[in-house]
Design a protein with these regions (language model features):
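Walker A (P-loop) ATP-phosphate-binding motif of ABC ATPase nucleotide-binding domains
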Residues: 1
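Loop/turn-to-beta-strand initiation segments
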Residues: 55-62, 81
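A short acidic, amphipathic alpha-helical/loop segment
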Residues: 70-74
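Conserved phosphate-donor/acceptor-positioning beta-strand/loop module used by diverse small-molecule
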Residues: 78-96, 124
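Hydrophobic anchor at the beta1->P-loop junction of P-loop NTPases
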Residues: 4
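P-loop (Walker A) phosphate-binding loop of NTP-binding proteins
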Residues: 7
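Conserved substrate/cofactor phosphate-moiety recognition/catalytic segment
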Residues: 10-57
Length: 159
């Protein structure tokens, strides 16, 4: 399972969609679960859905995961890798303003300020790379993790 997390507007959903497309093109079954909601109940529901997904292929979960308790809940599910997607606050605010389902700007500020960084297996700064490059990096990491599940465990790959 791959959890793509970060503040609103960082690019998580765009990147997760690109990753799903790349893997699907390669014949890998992919389940993508997404939520923009910030409630504990939502994360419990996401965890239940992700845990019940078939074990073949890749399960992608896209959400802020800005609270450590939500990260811990997902880590308890087993073989889970966290990809932390970051961007500057200015970038997150601008992207939020330009998307169809923008959240309240105050919400972006709160999540950005209160975001508890996960012990990420891969970190991507979307101020430094585009979604296509970010997706390529994640797919490469997924392939590495599949070949050697212990690889880079607990140590972030900064790309």
């Amino acid at each position: 399972m791959i959890v793509v997390c970060g503040p609103p507007g960082a690019g998580k959903t765009t990147i997760a969609t690109h990753v799903r497309h790349r893997l699907t093109q390669r014949g890998v079954p992919v389940r993508l679960f997404h939520s923009d909601d910030f409630s504990s109940r939502t994360y419990e529901q996401l965890a239940d859905q992700a845990a019940s997904a078939p074990s073949d292929g890749v399960t992608l979960v896209d959400g802020t995961f800005y609270r450590r308790e939500w990260q811990t809940r997902f880590r308890a599910l087993g073989d889970v890798r966290f990809v932390s997607v970051t961007a500057s606050l200015a970038t997150c605010l601008e992207r939020n303003r330009n998307r169809a389902n923008a959240i309240d700007e105050q919400g972006v500020h709160v999540v950005y300020r209160e975001f508890e960084e996960p012990n990420a297996d891969l970190e991507i700064d979307t101020d430094q790379c585009d979604p296509t490059t970010a997706a390529d990096r994640i797919v490469t990491a997924i392939e590495t993790w599949a070949e050697d599940p212990a690889s880079e465990s607990g140590r972030p790959l900064r790309r």
